[in-house]
Amino acid sequence: MSFHDLHHQGVPFVLPNAWDVPSALAYLADGFVAVGTTSFGVSSSGGHPDGARATRDANIALAAALAPLQCYVSIDVEDGYSDDPDAVADYVAQLPVAGINIEDSTHERLVDPALAAAKVAAIKQRNPELFINARVDTYWLHQEANTATTIERALRYVDAGADGIFVPLANDRGELAEITRNIPRPVNTLPVRGLTLTELGELGVARVSTGSVAYGAGLYAAAQAARAVRDGQPLPRATPYADLQSRLVEYEKRTRTT
């Protein structure tokens, strides 16, 4: 089954988002067949806030590090790190991945949809087989957060060659149903509180990305473990050291043969 096929299974395809090799290995150990990345997790790990084009070089390194894994990889490239569509296409061409996620905002402001569409078109022309997931940030940024604008922007990206549309924080049942009904491509959301995976599928959602949820949960768990030691409480459950080490040993062997 191809990465494209995973978006057409009748039930939403769950894409967990990693920020480094160990997090990706953890997902594979749990049976996932594809891994995305979280730009927030990558930028935060380097001490940078999200959305500031700070992950450009880190993503090149991460894509190369994840390439030996026996799974599909999709990289979150923020806005492509440039306002020049050809420069964005040049950047994406360096990534040995099955898909990318590219957003239509820069520095927390929506950009002209014509520019975002031009980026999608340039990428698709350079790499026709790449799965381009175009993110519409209307709801995420609370800017023109309505179905009409969201659908209008999404259709421009579809016409430019987008294979999927990501609408994070579109959480209302009725709005989600309207969005998926009017976009002729797989629609991607973040987890929606109060809606199960099955219910999201019934609303027409094809893919659910974990986003930064797992990264945030990991930071919370780290602080919780430290508090437990400090306060004399039972330690929380954790993946055993031996399992983590074993995964990395196997990963290192694989990198030597690829």
Predicted feature residues:
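N-terminal amphipathic alpha-helix/helix-capping segment at the start of soluble metabolic enzymes
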Residues: 1-17, 21-29, 120-125, 130, ...
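Active-site mouth loops of central-metabolism enzymes
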Residues: 6-23, 48-56, 73-87, 133-149, ...
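Catalytic beta/alpha-barrel core
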Residues: 15, 19, 100-103, 147, ...
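Catalytic cores of alpha/beta
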Residues: 21-29, 75, 81-95, 193-206
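Glycine-rich, proline-tolerant flexible connector loops at the mouths of alpha/beta enzymes
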Residues: 34-60, 79-84, 98-115, 123, ...
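Alpha-helix-loop-beta-strand connector modules within alpha/beta enzyme cores
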Residues: 49-75, 110-135, 171-195
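Conserved anion-binding
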Residues: 98-153, 231-247
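Extended, intrinsically disordered, low-complexity segments
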Residues: 212-258
